[in-house]
C-alpha cells in the first residue's frame, strides 16, 4: 500500500514539473538523491562565493549549471546537531541533539558521549525506503557511536566511514583510536589501518570516500532510486589531503583539502553524466556549520564577509555555501535569495520521492521544490540555537540577537577565539549578554558583518522587532523540547570494542563505567 501511495504522489509531482515546463517522460521514476555535506567548510571557501584564489572549478561549474543559495543556513554552529537536523528535518531542540548542562552551551558527540539519535526520530533514509530507495552513507556519521545508534539501524543500507571525527592519534589506553566501519563492523582505526600523517597532512581518506561513492552509484543507477549521503571530513582540523594534492593550493593545507574535495565532486558529477542519469539525480552541496576560524588559515577556512565562525550564532557560524544541481529541471545559472536551511533537505528529498513528512511531529524543514523549479520565494524564519537557548532569529533581511556570546573569558585568555580579529564592541561578548528585553537588530543586506545594530529609536527597528517577536512567540509557544541526548558522558562507552574488533584483534578493555555530566566549556 505504501508503494502505491508513493507512486501516486510521484505522479502528482510530475504534474507539477510539467506545469513548470520541466516535465519528465517515460515511466514515473523518482530521482536519485545525492547530498554532499562538507565539514567546517565556510561560505567564503568557493570561487563562486568570491574566494580569490578560485580553486574550486568543479563546484563553480556546478553553480553555473544549477542554482546558488547565498542565504542558506545550518541548524546549529556545531557538527553533530546540524547533521541530526538534516536527517530529521527538525531543530536540535526537537530531536534531542542539545545539552541542558549549562546555559547556552554547544554540544556534540565525542566518543565518550552516552547519547545519540533517538529511535523515536524518523530519519530520511528510513522514510525513503517507502519509495524504494537504497541508501548509503559515506564518511562521518556523528549521531552516536554506540550500537543502538548505528546508521544501519536508522534506515541506511550501507555505510563506509566513521561514527566520530578523525581526532587522534591516541594511545588505545587512556583513549582508543576512532574506528572506521564497513556496514555493521569496524574494518580498522584512524591512524592505524587508515593513516593520517599530522606532520605532512597526508591521508588517502578522501580518495577512499570518492571510490565508495562511485562504486555505489555504478551499482545502483540502473536498478533502484538511490540516496547517497556523502559526508566527508577532510576540511575539519586536522585537515588532510592525498599526496597528489598536497602543496597544490595557494591557501595552504586547508586549501589542499578543498581542492581534493572539489576534484572528487567533479568526478562524481562526471560519472552521473557518463551513466546518463544526471537528469534523474538531484544533487545538493552544503556544509554542516561555518568555518572554524580558530584553526585558520592553515587548518581552517573562510566565512567571507560574515562575523565570527563555527561555535557561534553569528552569521559566520551558520551561513553556509549551498548549490543545487539537477540538469533539465533546475535552470542553470540561477541565484535564489530564499532563506534556506539544512533541514529543508529532509522535506525536499521526501517531496522528490513523492512522500510527505511524518504528520505526528513538528517539521522545521521546508519543501524547496517551488524555489528550485519555479523560482518562488517563501517567507520563513531562521532560528539560531546554542544548546537549549534561542540566541537569535532572522526574518527577511533583519536578524535579532536575544543573547550574544562568543566564548568565555577563561577560554579566550587561553587562546581560544572563535572571532579572531573581529571584535565588535557590545556584540562579540565574552560574557553571555542578555538582550531579550531590547534585542540587537541588524539589516543583513546592508550589514552582513553584523557590525552596526539598528538604532532602538528608529522606525525600522520597531517594525522589524514587531515582526520577529511575533514569529518567535509562535515558535516558543508551540515548542516541545525533546529529552536532551548530549548531557551524559562516560569513558567506558568509548570505542574500545566496536563490532568486528574480534576478527581484527582490535578489541580493547574499557575502564570502569562512571557516568557523569559532560563538560561543555564553551
Swiss-Prot record:
Stretches the record annotates as Catalytic domain: 27-379
Molecular functions per Gene Ontology: arylsulfatase activity; metal ion binding; N-acetylgalactosamine-4-sulfatase activity; N-acetylgalactosamine-6-sulfatase activity; sulfuric ester hydrolase activity
InterPro entries per the UniProt record, alphabetical: Alkaline_phosphatase_core_sf, GALNS, Sulfatase, Sulfatase_CS, Sulfatase_N
Mutagenesis / variant outcome for changing residue 113 to F: In MPS4A; severe form; common mutation; found in patients with Irish-British ancestry
Location in or out of the cell: Lysosome
Listed result of changing residue 116 to V: In MPS4A; reduced enzymatic activity
Active site location: 79, 142
Effect annotated for changing residue 166 to Q: In MPS4A; severe form
Predominant location category: other
Disulphide-bonded residues: 308-419, 489-518, 501-507
Phenotype for residue 156 to L: In MPS4A; reduced enzymatic activity
Stretch forming the signal peptide: 1-26
Effect of residue 391 to V: In MPS4A; severe form
Effect listed in the UniProt record for changing residue 291 to D: In MPS4A; mild form
Effect of residue 111 to R: In MPS4A; intermediate form
Protein EC: 3.1.6.4
Keyword terms, alphabetized: Calcium, Disease variant, Disulfide bond, Dwarfism, Glycoprotein, Hydrolase, Lysosome, Metal-binding, Mucopolysaccharidosis, Signal
Glycosylation sites: 204, 423
Disease: Mucopolysaccharidosis 4A: A form of mucopolysaccharidosis type 4, an autosomal recessive lysosomal storage disease characterized by intracellular accumulation of keratan sulfate and chondroitin-6-sulfate. Key clinical features include short stature, skeletal dysplasia, dental anomalies, and corneal clouding. Intelligence is normal and there is no direct central nervous system involvement, although the skeletal changes may result in neurologic complications. There is variable severity, but patients with the severe phenotype usually do not survive past the second or third decade of life.
Protein name: N-acetylgalactosamine-6-sulfatase
Name of the gene: GALNS
Amino acid at each position: 500500500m505504501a508503494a502505491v501511495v508513493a507512486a501516486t504522489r510521484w505522479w502528482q509531482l510530475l504534474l507539477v514539473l510539467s506545469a513548470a515546463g520541466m516535465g519528465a517522460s517515460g515511466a514515473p521514476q523518482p530521482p536519485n538523491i545525492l547530498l554532499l555535506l562538507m565539514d567546517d567548510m565556510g561560505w567564503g571557501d568557493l570561487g563562486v562565493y568570491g574566494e580569490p584564489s578560485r580553486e574550486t572549478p568543479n563546484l563553480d561549474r556546478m553553480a553555473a549549471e544549477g542554482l546558488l543559495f547565498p542565504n542558506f543556513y545550518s541548524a546549529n554552529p556545531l557538527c553533530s546537531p546540524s547533521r541530526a537536523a538534516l536527517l530529521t528535518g527538525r531543530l536540535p531542540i526537537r530531536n534531542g541533539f542539545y545539552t541542558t548542562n549549562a546555559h547556552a552551551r554547544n554540544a556534540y558527540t565525542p566518543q565518550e558521549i552516552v547519547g545519540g539519535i533517538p529511535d523515536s526520530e524518523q530519519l530520511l533514509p528510513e522514510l525513503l525506503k517507502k519509495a524504494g530507495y537504497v541508501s548509503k552513507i559515506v564518511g562521518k556519521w556523528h549521531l552516536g557511536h554506540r550500537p543502538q545508534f548505528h546508521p544501519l539501524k536508522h534506515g541506511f543500507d550501507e555505510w563506509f566511514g566513521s561514527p566520530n571525527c578523525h581526532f587522534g592519534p591516541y594511545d588505545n589506553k587512556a583513549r582508543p583510536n576512532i574506528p572506521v566501519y564497513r556496514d555493521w563492523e569496524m574494518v580498522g582505526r584512524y591512524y592505524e589501518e587508515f593513516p593520517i600523517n599530522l606532520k605532512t597532512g597526508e591521508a588517502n581518506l578522501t580518495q577512499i570516500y570518492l571510490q565508495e561513492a562511485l562504486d555505489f552509484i555504478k551499482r545502483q543507477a540502473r536498478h533502484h532510486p538511490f540516496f547517497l549521503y556523502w559526508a566527508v571530513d577532510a576540511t575539519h582540523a586536522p585537515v588532510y589531503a592525498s599526496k597528489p594534492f598536497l602543496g597544490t593550493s595557494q591557501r595552504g593545507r586547508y586549501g589542499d583539502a578543498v581542492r581534493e574535495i572539489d576534484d572528487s565532486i567533479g568526478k562524481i558529477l562526471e560519472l552521473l553524466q557518463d551513466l546518463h542519469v544526471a537528469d534523474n539525480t538531484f544533487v545538493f552541496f552544503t556544509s554542516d556549520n561555518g568555518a572554524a576560524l580558530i584553526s585558520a588559515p592553515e587548518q581552517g577556512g573562510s566565512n567571507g564577509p560574515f562575523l565570527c565562525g563555527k561555535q557561534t550564532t553569528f552569521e559566520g557560524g551558520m551561513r553556509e555555501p549551498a548549490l543545487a544541481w539537477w540538469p533539465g529541471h533546475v535552470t542553470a545559472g540561477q541565484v535564489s535569495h530564499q532563506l534556506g536551511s539544512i533541514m529543508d533537505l529532509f522535506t525536499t528529498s521526501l517531496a522528490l520521492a513523492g512522500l510527505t513528512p511524518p504528520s505526528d511531529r513538528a517539521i522545521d524543514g521546508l519543501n524547496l521544490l517551488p524555489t528550485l523549479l519555479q523560482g518562488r520565494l517563501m517567507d520563513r524564519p531562521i532560528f539560531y540555537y546554542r544548546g537549549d537557548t534561542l540566541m537569535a532569529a532572522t526574518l527577511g533581511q533583519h536578524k535579532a540577537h536575544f543573547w550574544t556570546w562568543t566564548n568565555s573569558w577563561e577560554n579566550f585568555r587561553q587562546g581560544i577565539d572563535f572571532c579572531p580579529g573581529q571584535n565588535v564592541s557590545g556584540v562579540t561578548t565574552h560574557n553571555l549578554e542578555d538582550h531579550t528585553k531590547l534585542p540587537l537588530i541588524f539589516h543583513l543586506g546592508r550589514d552582513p558583518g553584523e557590525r552596526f545594530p539598528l538604532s532602538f529609536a528608529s522606525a525600522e527597528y520597531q517594525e522589524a522587532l514587531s515582526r520577529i517577536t511575533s514569529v518567535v512567540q509562535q515558535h516558543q509557544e508551540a515548542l516541545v523540547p525533546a529529552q536532551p541526548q548530549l548531557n551524559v558522558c562516560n569513558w567506558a562507552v568509548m570505542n574500545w570494542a566496536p563490532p568486528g574488533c574480534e576478527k581484527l584483534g582490535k578489541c580493547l578493555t574499557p575502564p570502569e563505567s562512571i557516568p557523569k555530566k559532560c563538560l561543555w566549556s564553551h
